[in-house]
């Protein structure tokens, strides 16, 4: 009986492996190879830039009358220091925290008298190119002598329709990315 059970177990094990051994790549299929690198050290975000507050200009709701309209971009910087010599450049990668999936902008989270049909859009260093949440802004060189860098980005109002007056509060997260 024990011998039969062992033979049955081996036969079943062979059946489960058989499809894998003889499987062939089907037409229209391929592979994806991921390569990366983990760094032992990172730059330190300067104290005043860890939790940054950017005050956008006060504008009339009438200045954002249709979806896609934007307000003037307001500059903000993120500075880092104590960067390891092995790193040559740094950028902010803006997470999908509080993201509108349709626009990939930051939704308005104001709880008291919120403005309607308005979000905050991140903009790259040129003041024109949108940075969609889940993306990385431009990389900035790390100064080898000071082991520091300052990244410059913008935020601006972005209408999702005819806007209504009120408060705007938009919060997202970022992490540092390196090259």
Indicate where each model-derived feature is located:
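Mature extracellular/passenger domains of Gram-negative fimbrial/pilin and adhesin proteins
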Residues: 2-8, 19-179
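Hydrophobic helical h-region of N-terminal Sec-dependent signal peptides
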Residues: 10-14
